Amino acid sequence: MAALAAAGLALGAKKGKPLGVQLYTIRSLVPTKARESIQALAQIGFKEVETLRAINNVVLPLCKEFGLKPVAGHFDLAMITAQPSGFQKAIDEAQAAGIKYIVIPYVPNGDRGGPDVYKRMAKAINEAGTLCAKAGLQLCYHQHAFEFGEVQGQRPWDILLSETDPGTMALELDVFWVSVAGLDPVKLIRDLKGRAKLLHLKDKAPGVPKQYSEAVSPGAFREVGLGSLDFPAILKAAADMKVEHYFVEQDQTAGDPIGSVRTSFRNLAKLGF
């Protein structure tokens, strides 16, 4: 913890960014404790949220009430590829909520395949991204680990990046999943040269084996500062590459999700947030 605090002295003045939270983290609380959960996030000190469409009707009014700004939202891949009518609905919903970044959160197993599948996906993403830009919004892609595994000699990651226009598809980089796939988040952030506009922040337990599947042990997920990732270096690279928004996220928590994000918030505060 002392190392976190010391690093914060060097990093704090450079970022000046508000810290957000991905509401997927509190999905289990929304059915019965939505109001107190959103209020708790505001009391912790979060200023921004990233939403997911399935719970927007419940959480968006509460975010407005408690002063949490929705800046990004997860919309299912099926909406993104259903142009133009299906995707226009995503644009309309985002604009109504004040969301700037429409994020593709996940590619379901049934939508994965060989290189041609990802080339077709990239074409649809380019079309959706163009519609986004015309509406004053930004389309982003959130990666997991599978994108870094080879399929017929090619990585989906490389296909998606090379076949899409950086102006129409930015990235939401999840540092946990980058590390699970055996890559260095710091190097990847820098290699992307500013294409990563959003960052998901969560830590990884020591000793988690390299893999391209999302089927990791729940114990692999750790709060920021309680795992093996080098967050001072990650945040320095992100600041240098002008990442625009940062979101704490925990796919799985050992206990209370609110307590989990509180821990990450406090440790990130020591790094200058």
Protein language model features and the residues they cover:
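Hydrophobic faces of well-ordered beta-strands that scaffold small-molecule active sites
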Residues: 17-22, 49-51, 70-75, 102-104, ...
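Acidic (Asp/Glu)-rich catalytic clusters
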Residues: 14-16, 38-43, 56-72, 86-99, ...
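N-terminal export signals
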Residues: 1-13
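Boundary/entry segment of secreted carbohydrate-active catalytic domains
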Residues: 14-32, 37, 44-48
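Acidic-and-aromatic substrate-binding clefts and catalytic sites of carbohydrate-active enzymes
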Residues: 27-32, 48-60, 77-85, 109-113, ...
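Acidic/histidine-rich catalytic cores of soluble enzymes
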Residues: 133-228
